Amino acid sequence: MSLLAAVFLGVLQAATEFLPVSSTAHLLVFGELLGHDLADPRFRAFATIIQTGTTLAVLVYFRTEILSLLAAGLRSLARRRPLETPQSRLAWFIVLGTVPAAVLGKLFEERIEALGNWVIAGSLVVLGLVLLAAERYARHLRTVEDVGARDAVLIGLGQALALVPGSSRSGTTITAGMLLGFTREAAARFSFLLSVPIILGAGGYKLWKTVPVLRGEPSWALATLVGTAVSAVAGYLVIDWLLGWLRTRTTHLFVVWRIAAGVALAILIWQGVLPAGHASVSAPAVEAARAADPDAPLGAALRR
């Protein structure tokens, strides 16, 4: 992968990770259009690892709130009164909202990874329409301080739905928040805070699984490092822009974006430009391929 492509995909990851439009769909489509084999484990490792850049962006942007929530949660735990303050309640509701995605992600990990591009196209369109319904019919009056246990569970289920490729984690959680009556900005802010435990846990696990794929691949390792750094910087800017946008504007832009992207993806699949499905290659398979022929390029070794 060229460094220019890594920079482009890093910016794309940052924009589509936080906007409710699905980073998975955009990375796979543009990765294919840039000439990369979606089944190549190096590309899939790149696509996974650069997500740590956007994770870092969330941690830096919300660092004050995260530290405050962490301190409040620990103090309430020590006092055995978890709901004693608004901050401690929010901290524990974030933990509660993390449970659905953590449990379902572990149970259905392999099935989710096997889902193909038709599912991505369908998710883009269907959830775009749900976002439109949330925009048009829900009351947008509640703030982050109004989050309760029921809200945390329901938005957490929205986060679990984002395990389906093409759904968009920010898209499903922001939509769920809006359907529950939160303002657009409050729904987005809670979405970002809710993402911290799951992206640290799931992201760390995926990082551990995929980093070995890039061993002995210096050009891919460099491209991944550059893409990750770019996604971190761009991600910070995107978060700031999105929160400002949602204070005064609707989500109609993202509804149109999702539906257009879903239709475009369906056309590309139908025309044979993109595959209907994709194969995933595990780290053990990579090690086996390298053991069979240490001198062969990884892509060629895996195809044997």
Curated annotation (Swiss-Prot):
It catalyses: di-trans,octa-cis-undecaprenyl diphosphate + H2O = di-trans,octa-cis-undecaprenyl phosphate + phosphate + H(+). Bacitracin is thought to be involved in the inhibition of peptidoglycan synthesis by sequestering undecaprenyl diphosphate, thereby reducing the pool of lipid carrier available. One of its GO terms (biological process) is response to antibiotic. GO terms for cellular component: plasma membrane. The chain crosses the membrane at residues 1-21, 54-74, 90-110, 114-134, 192-212, 225-245, 253-273. This is Undecaprenyl-diphosphatase. It comes from the Bacteria. The keyword Hydrolase applies. It is found in: Cell inner membrane.
